[in-house]
Every structure is written in structure tokens, then in C-alpha cells.
Amino acid sequence: LLTDRDVLDAQIPGRDLLIVTNTTVAKLYLARLTGSFAQRRIAECILPDGEQHKTLQTAGWVFDALVANKMNRDATVLALGGGVVGDIAGFAAASYQRGIGYVQMPTTLLAQVDSSVGGKTGVNHPGGKNLIGAFYQPRAVIADTDVLATLPDRELKSGLAEVIKHGCVWDPLLFNWLDRSIPQLLARDAEALTYAIGRSCEIKATVVARDEREHDLRAILNFGHTFGHAIEAATGYDKYLHGEAVGLGMLIAADLSHRLGLIDAAVKERLRDVMVRTGLPTEAPRIGAARAYELMQMDKKVVAGAVRLVLLEKLGRAIITDQYPKAALDATLAEHFK
């Protein structure tokens, strides 16, 4: 798709185009993509790679590029990269001149199955993840599975964590399929990856269509994220990939669900087994229970000081609640964060 002019011309409007990417992806795909456009005025903004660079300062470089190239409201921002690039580019597009067009071309599995769909954009703050941002829908998402051939194994596994999440909260058949298909997915079998991506996008699109602004239902897609975001923030956004932190968060949320009697031990252990066989971490960092809870209080689902959590009732069904004994949460945090 990177070189398919018919697709690019149909999905990416306007003459003026700012391609936002990072140093890693630029070396692999930027020249190939820019060579696929005819009669366009193209500018480039190449960002440093990594979650630790998902900041207002980095977003400022995108604004600088838009201004320097005299881009107006007819321009389009094209995000070529993973979740960090997509979030920053989308945030810049949402903010510049109060909103210009943008298109996502996700190059990681995590971005293709999750972050490129749904319109969440933003940057991190030292006080918490994604605290600064906007809901802003891309005009198109162009997911080329061929680019996953160059994705590092660790990034592939990180993306699979979000597929596992979709199975946990919405589709037990997807979870069962994942349970059987981990070897094929890790081997990058094209048919398996295409199904995982397609089904994940269907699930997320269904949920977002019912609750775009995350008033209630969409919050189930944050399963594992309240704990996971605390892990990312506590470790400076540079020790764990996003999917790795979310995977740890799902295990912690499943443990709490079990303590509350919502699921039995077999469900919790089955989820852990899938994580282990996927090659995802299963032991949370020892950041301390008090620090973890402090960071959780900055979560966007907090209402009137109450930390709302996404918990499992069974595989394929999640609830959002703040009605749980604080002692159960404290015991869970103490168990996992020491």
C-alpha cells in the first residue's frame, strides 16, 4: 500500500502534505512513500523514536514544521509510524489552525490493531500518560501488513497484548483463537496476522461507534491500562513498551477480579499462560504499592476522586466500576508492586 498511488490518492486529500515519522521508520519507508505521490507539495518531520519522546516539546516540532512550510487548513498530516507517531501527529493536526486533516499509516502491530483506530490523540506528562490530548478522528487509516516484516519481535509481542485485550473484554472466540494461534502469530503468518488485525479493528470500531468520547462503554478498552499506565509513568516511559505494560496491567486487573469473586482462578491462570506463551512480561516492577496508587489517581477514568477500574466478569465481558473494597485493591497492589 505504501506504493499504491490509487489508494494514496483516494484516501489522502489535498496538495500539501506533512509526513510525520520517526528516525527508525524513516530509514525503512519514508523514501518509498514520498516517491509514490505525484503533484504534491510534501514536507517531512522526523521525530526521535520512543515513548519517552511523546511530549509537548516533540509535538512542538510538528507545529514548527507546519508553520515553516506555510501549511494551511487544506493541508493533511500523514502519520507514518507506530502509536507514538500517530498520537503526536493527530494531536498536532487537531490543534493546528483549530484542526486540519490527518491520515494514519500505522507501521506497528499495536498501532494497526488499536491506537490508529478511534481518534484518541495526545502526549504524555511527567504526572501521567496521555494527560494532554484530544479526540480527533483521522480521515483514513491505511494499514499495510507488509511493513510488519521489519517489526522487531519485541514490538510484535507488544502489539499482541492489545489483541489479547480485545478478546478478554469483548470476544471470547477471539481469545480462544489466540490461545491456539500464538505460534503462527509469532512466526508472522500472514493469514493469522490479517485476521488478528481485522477482528481487532472490527471490535474497536464497534465500541467507538457507540461511545466515541469514552463516557462509559469505550472505557472497557482500557482493560489493563490503569495499572499499565502507572507502570509506564513510574519507569519513565522507557523500560516497558506500551503493550508490555498493558499486559502486566491485565494480569493485575484479572487478579483483582478474582479476589472480588468475579472470575475463578482458572480464568486468571489462562490469561497468564497466554501472556507467557506470547513472550510478554508477567512480573510487575517493584515501584511500591503507594506509588502505583498515586499514579492511578491521575487516570482519566477517575471520577470525584474514585479510581474506576475495568475488571473481568468472564472472558469476553468486562465491567467498569469503582464499587470494590479498597482493601482488595490495596492487597492486589501490595502483591504485585511489593
Regions found by a protein language model. Name each.
Residues F91-Q184:
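A glycine/threonine-rich phosphate-anchoring loop and its flanking beta-alpha core
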